[in-house]
């Protein structure tokens, strides 16, 4: 019988009054209240059933009571007393079926003062439920509203902070902090979804036979945690271990992994790492005699990042991740180690491809400057982001971010929030979407100088960069790309000259060595005191490349001789494979020589090096002095005009051949020339700085001049007894 039939039995068919425990059941099984039976017997002098007219021969008092009615009435009384006693139901409430009937026929239920409620203490013991700790009115249309003390039936757990529940037949969402869970929901099985393909069987079958092979989007059952970076799972009928960073666990699996993390920390201390002497990037793990299974090693965050980088650079249609033998790095050392790749044959078009953000260690007195080197053929998946600002987590489910930190986004959590994993710490959490920005959104052009460097970053020491920055941003004059070659990089300490025009200032020049790879990534310096200068495949020249040649300065026609910017070439070996060496330009506001009286002190021998000249800047460019090699690009000799610096005697009119001499280099005197004279000079004027010891040593350089060159015009400078000669027609 349904609820409505049971409720009809509570009414007397004759007087329609409510029945109680004194009601009597006749032999025909019809039940009436006792007062109605007494009135019928008094009126007719006999007792017959008012429904079927069946005669009743026994006394009214001897008739039995309806046991079903008694039980129903007892249930009503127990339900009312339970509601007043603070049970899971409020007074006057009904079961779920009663709530549905109230929506279909509310008037009939309101007319009846009784509610049919079963014994809830017996039936609700296994039902997941929670008790409200405070009043909650909700902020969104889908939120559940309740008062303090209400009992809410739990339907499912949305995440760590939200539940979906039901009260009085109304479902909605509510925060977990507003209720006290009385009976927990049944936990789903610990599962995780594969984010990438994982297969190490082809690498080394003997070493990786215990690894679990899976494909992307496979669902794996998590069994336990092996160590900090590996877990044991089951896929189908296969059981094995797999890297945790390759999967996305659900809430149950995450709790299981976190619970076992503390237990495994003591076990990982007993594991010994044996590095291979033949290979610097592979290691094996020594297994103890009593271990149950072989653990291939701690799959560190560094190895995962390198694997992600290889996946990023793979073709877009490729989903298989090429995984090399895991690099075993101690989990207690989170510093990132770049694998050596000097022998890799990388084309020059791939220069500047993405590399993980690795802050290089610098000395305490040096700050760091970040240089962005974007490549022309870089492409990243859309889920790779970089933090624009630092973000501190306000809850256990949020992710701490540091400025410049890489993040892989797993998906959208809600409006304005993203869920992702940090590429530095490996933690998974949510964070605001306005704190991150996708990297490499512009792949073929350079970022604007006002925008932050969101591309592949390397860390420089400011000892190799001037205090005002020698890296020019987006110079329109330097639009032609340079070829990328292996160039020994020189380290320069720029020193501002405070001397006046009439005094002699000194600049110090310091050299260092650092290798640069073709793929744009940098090796760390062997000593923290030796800074690394970045030279990459750039469309603009960020700094100076110095070579131990005779110093040659080029000043374009129409540019005054006032010092603005100086480019010096200095090196120790010729460029490889016949490619032109990369020469970089320091702009006017960042010049290292700030007066004509400044000088440079060289510390190396002179080695002739063939190099291609720089592209000639337009005549409207700001004042600068560019390097002009001895041979022009097209091989055509043009008119050459010279300026020679000597101490006490005027230069002879014939040519001299340079001879290296030993001794202290002297500083050139201040160059004084009017702007019209400087403007009248040819576009290939060469300034020669000669090293002299004590007095005049006769050291000059061969000058190639056209046969049409006329007599030399001499201009003598009066400063410090120095004579300046300008040969011209």
From Swiss-Prot:
The record's SMART domains line, in alphabetical order, gives: RING, SH3
Where in the numbering of this chain does the SH3 domain appear? 125-184, 187-252, 380-441
Classification via InterPro entries = Endophilin_SH3RF, SH3-like_dom_sf, SH3_domain, SH3RF2_RING-HC_Zfn, SH3RF2_SH3_1, SH3RF2_SH3_2, SH3RF2_SH3_3, Znf_RING
Domain remark from Swiss-Prot or TrEMBL = The RING finger domain is required for ubiquitin ligase activity and autoubiquitination.
Name of this protein: E3 ubiquitin-protein ligase SH3RF2
Residues annotated with Phosphoserine modification: 649
In terms of Gene3D superfamilies, this protein maps to: SH3 Domains, Zinc/RING finger domain, C3HC4 (zinc finger)
Instruction: Please state the residue ranges covered by RING-type zinc fingers.
Output: 12-53
Processing after translation: Autoubiquitinated.
Family statement: Belongs to the SH3RF family.
Q: Does the keyword Magnesium apply?
A: no
Known pathway: Protein modification; protein ubiquitination
| Region annotation Interaction with PPP1CA: where it falls in the sequence | 641-646
Q: Where is this region: Disordered?
A: 78-105, 258-297, 497-526, 610-677
Subunit relationships: Interacts with FASLG and PPP1CA. Interacts with PAK4 and TNFRSF1A. Interacts with DLK1, MAP3K10/MLK2, MAPK8IP1/JIP1, MAPK8IP2/JIP2 and MAPK8IP3/JIP3. Interacts with RAC1 (both active GTP- or inactive GDP-bound forms).
Principal subcellular localization: nucleus
Report the function annotation for this chain.
Has E3 ubiquitin-protein ligase activity. Acts as an anti-apoptotic regulator of the JNK pathway by ubiquitinating and promoting the degradation of SH3RF1, a scaffold protein that is required for pro-apoptotic JNK activation. Facilitates TNF-alpha-mediated recruitment of adapter proteins TRADD and RIPK1 to TNFRSF1A and regulates PAK4 protein stability via inhibition of its ubiquitin-mediated proteasomal degradation. Inhibits PPP1CA phosphatase activity.
């Amino acid at each position: 019988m349904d609820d409505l039939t049971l409720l009809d039995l509570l009414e007397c068919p004759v007087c329609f009054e409510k029945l109680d425990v004194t009601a009597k059941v006749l032999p025909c099984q019809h039940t009436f209240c006792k007062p109605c039976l007494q009135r019928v017997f008094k009126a007719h002098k006999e007792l017959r059933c008012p429904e079927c007219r069946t005669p009743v021969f026994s006394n009214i008092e001897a008739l039995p009571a309806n046991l079903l009615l008694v039980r129903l009435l007892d249930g009503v009384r127990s339900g009312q007393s339970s509601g007043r006693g603070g049970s899971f139901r409020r007074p006057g409430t009904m079961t779920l079926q009663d709530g549905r009937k109230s929506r279909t026929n509310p008037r009939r239920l309101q007319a009846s003062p009784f509610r049919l409620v079963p014994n809830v203490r017996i039936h609700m013991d296994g039902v997941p439920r929670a008790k409200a700790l405070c009043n909650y009115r909700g902020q969104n249309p889908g939120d559940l509203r309740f008062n303090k003390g209400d009992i809410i039936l739990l339907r499912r757990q949305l995440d760590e902070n939200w539940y979906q529940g039901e009260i009085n037949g109304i479902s909605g969402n509510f925060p977990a902090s507003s209720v006290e869970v009385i009976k927990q929901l049944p936990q789903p099985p610990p599962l995780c979804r594969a984010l990438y393909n994982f297969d190490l069987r082809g690498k080394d079958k003997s070493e990786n036979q215990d690894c679990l092979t899976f494909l992307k989007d496979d669902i794996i059952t998590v069994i336990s945690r092996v160590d900090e970076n590996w877990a044991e799972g089951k896929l189908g009928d296969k059981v094995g271990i797999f890297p945790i960073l390759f999967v996305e666990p659900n809430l149950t699996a995450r709790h299981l992994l976190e619970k076992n993390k503390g237990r495994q920390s003591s076990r990982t201390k007993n594991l010994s790492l044996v590095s291979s002497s033949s290979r610097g990037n592979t290691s094996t793990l020594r297994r103890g005699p009593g271990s149950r299974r072989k653990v291939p090693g701690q799959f560190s965050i560094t190895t995962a990042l390198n694997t992600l980088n290889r996946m990023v650079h793979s073709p877009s249609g490729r989903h298989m991740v090429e995984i090399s033998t895991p690099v075993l790095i101690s989990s207690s050392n989170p510093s990132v180690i770049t694998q050596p790749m000097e022998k890799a044959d990388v084309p020059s078009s791939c220069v500047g491809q993405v590399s993980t953000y690795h802050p290089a260690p610098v000395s305490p007195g040096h700050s760091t400057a970040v240089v962005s080197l974007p490549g022309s053929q870089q492409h990243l998946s859309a889920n790779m982001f970089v933090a624009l600002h630092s973000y501190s987590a306000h809850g256990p489910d949020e992710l701490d971010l540091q400025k410049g930190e890489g993040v892989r986004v797993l998906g959208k959590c809600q409006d304005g929030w993203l869920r992702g994993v940090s590429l530095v710490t490996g933690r998974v959490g949510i964070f605001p979407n306005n704190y991150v920005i996708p990297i490499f959104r512009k792949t073929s052009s350079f970022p604007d100088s006002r925008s932050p460097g969101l591309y592949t970053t390397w860390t420089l020491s400011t000892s190799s960069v001037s205090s005002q920055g020698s890296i020019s941003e987006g110079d329109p004059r330097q639009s032609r790309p340079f070829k990328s070659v292996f160039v020994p990089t020189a380290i320069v300490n720029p020193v501002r000259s405070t001397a006046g025009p009439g005094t002699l200032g000194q600049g110090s020049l310091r050299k260092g060595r650092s290798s640069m790879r073709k793929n744009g990534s940098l090796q760390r310096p062997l000593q923290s005191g030796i800074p690394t200068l970045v030279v990459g495949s750039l469309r603009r020249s960020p700094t100076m490349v110095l070579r131990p040649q005779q110093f040659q300065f080029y000043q374009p026609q129409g540019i005054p001789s006032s010092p603005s910017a100086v480019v010096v070439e200095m090196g120790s070996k010729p460029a490889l494979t016949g490619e032109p060496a990369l020469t970089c330009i320091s702009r006017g506001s960042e010049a290292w020589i700030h007066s004509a009286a400044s000088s440079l002190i060289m510390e190396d021998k002179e080695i002739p090096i063939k190099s291609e000249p720089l592209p000639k800047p337009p005549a409207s460019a700001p004042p600068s002095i560019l390097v002009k090699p001895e041979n022009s690009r097209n091989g055509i000799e043009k008119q050459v005009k010279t300026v020679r610096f000597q101490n006490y005697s005027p230069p002879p009119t014939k040519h001299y051949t340079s001879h290296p001499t030993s001794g202290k280099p002297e500083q050139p005197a201040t160059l004084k020339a009017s702007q019209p004279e400087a403007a009248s000079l040819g576009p290939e004027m060469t300034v020669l700085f000669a090293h002299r010891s004590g007095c005049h040593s006769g050291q000059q350089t061969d000058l190639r001049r056209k046969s049409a060159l006329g007599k030399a015009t001499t201009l003598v400078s009066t400063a410090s007894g120095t004579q300046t000669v300008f040969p011209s027609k």
